[in-house]
Amino acid sequence: TLVLTPTHLSNLDSPLIGYALHKAGLPPCIYGAGLNLFSNPAMSFFMSRLGAYTVDRRKKLRLYKDVLKDYSTEAIGRGAHSLFFPGGTRSRSGRLETDLKKGLLGTAITAWQDSLASERANPEVLVVPCTLSFALVLEAETLIEDALAAEGKSRYIISDDEFSEARTVASFARRVLNLDASTYVRFGRPLDLMGNPVDDLSL
């Protein structure tokens, strides 16, 4: 079972990764997406078909978080490939994330332990690092303003950025397609849950 851990620059990252996996002949991944991302009907249509399930980050109840973790643990344990953004939110500055969120990512370890305990066939869980490189970022203006603001580092959810407007997303897509530029999705070498590189021949 694979756990993909990409860098995170835009709300378009998840659909882009889903498309890249499809083009590479790789299986799709399930992933948690903020409830605010489903406010755009067009993107909601595609995201729900790319394996996204909703996560309401405004809910702080312990029960809600436990249910999300149990769902993720069970899905990975049953062999569902998963995607987690280890930074937890989009990078405001474009730099690689250093303050990693271990919440849902930790469910991979729990799923692996449960699989070993129940002696399931093929219990191995591998982490695949992934980087994204863009010429343009849809929400760049909003993210830059947020990074420069005093409260930028503490804000977690931006619910009214460019992604919420279907017309803006369509206009952005046209501009990107008219550029002589490429978007890169790079998959790194798989690692086991202890961080050790895995021999490709053993996969």
What residues fall within each predicted segment?
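C-terminal, non-catalytic macromolecule-binding modules
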Residues: 200-203
